[in-house]
Amino acid sequence: MNLVSIIMPTYNCGRFIKESIDSVLAQTYDNWELLIVDDCSTDDTEAIVRGYKDKRIHYMCNEQNIGAALTRNRALREAKGRYIAFLDADDLWLPEKLEKQVAFMGQHGYQFSYTYYSEMDSDGIDTGITVKGPFKITKAGMYAFCWPGCLTVMYDAQSIGLIQIEDIQKNNDYALWLKICKKADCYLLPEVLARYRRGRSGSVSSQRISTMIKWHYKLYRDAEMMQVIPSLWHTTMNIICGAYKKIKYVKHN
């Protein structure tokens, strides 16, 4: 049974992190390590995490606040698992998430995968929305739009290797996918295996279109080191594909 390293950066998520950790502890697949990297929270995050005595849970705190991108990088450097999975400190997994996704990748020889997820509000109440996506995302497809939800992604670190991203303020999960998609296509496991907490502070997807354009443009310029014209092109494609996703893949139950 291969080890799965779960990457959980956190900052002032004391209200939600216990529920997120409990969703990891409830997994039917038990060979995992949970790497919680705290970016200098000022709430009770540390006390909550240290209340867990499970040796698979590892808590680290940055010496100073360095932002989500570098915090995620630190967790990735510490990871020992063959597979890398991601769970933000306010999101949740369903119990069979790891078991089903590891099996899916192993059976088909996939190196990079994602799943459907449902949405809940800030109080954990189901909104009736399910987010799906295309079965296969190529490099071109990933550059066109960030199809996977971060909480659903898993990749084979044995094949992909260590991934580190630039110090960007937003879209750092998307920056990771753009690195990985150069080495492997991303495949969909078509089942809801995670719950995303909608309405979180700072989420790019919850901001107005002008703000989304700004952060996507900076992603291509700063993280991918693209020239102006290609950056503008991919930013435009992101806006178009975002509208398409809402029509094609965001389902109201």
Annotated model-derived regions:
Residues 1-25:
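N-proximal low-complexity "stem/linker" segments adjacent to membrane-targeting elements
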Residues 15-18, 43-51, 92, 96:
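Acidic helix N-cap motif at the loop->helix transition within catalytic regions
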Residues 23, 30, 38-47, 64, ...:
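A conserved acidic beta->alpha catalytic loop
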Residues 62-79, 100:
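Glycine-rich, basic loop-to-helix element that forms the pyrophosphate-binding segment
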Residues 77, 130-211, 215-216:
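Conserved nucleotide-sugar donor-binding catalytic segment
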Residues 84:
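Short aromatic/hydrophobic "clamp" motif used to bind/position activated sugar donors
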Residues 88-92, 116:
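The conserved acidic donor/metal-binding loop of glycosyltransferases
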Residues 96-127:
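Conserved donor NDP-sugar-binding/catalytic core segment of glycosyltransferases
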